[in-house]
Amino acid sequence: MPAFNVDEAHGLGVFGKQGRGVCDHFGVTEDIDLIMGTFSKSLASIGGFIAGDKEVINWLRHNARSYIFQASSTPAATAAAREALHIIKSEPERIQRLWDITSYALKSFRDAGFEIGET
């Protein structure tokens, strides 16, 4: 059976209800086996995450090479990511403002004669 893994590095805080990412945006969260992402983009921190079934996460913890010599996140980095998640969830106008700025930038580039494709 195929496994579906989604990297939400660029979707978290941007897509979906309350910025939950592309899986939420397209309504497929329950169909995804692993969701991974980083804290260094929309959460303005360091570190990352992988979410999935408990058995899979435990297997990764014990067998993935990327865990060798891995250190835990610092309390400050964890607190920063947590607060950023709270802000994303409680201030949806920030996501709307992002999309307003994006639309303005795309229109401005097109009006200036740039070929930017369909985005």
Annotate the PLM regions.
Residues 8-9, 26, 38-40, 52-54, ...:
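Fold-independent oxyanion-binding glycine-rich loops
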Residues 34-36, 43-89:
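Conserved core segment of the aminotransferase class I/II
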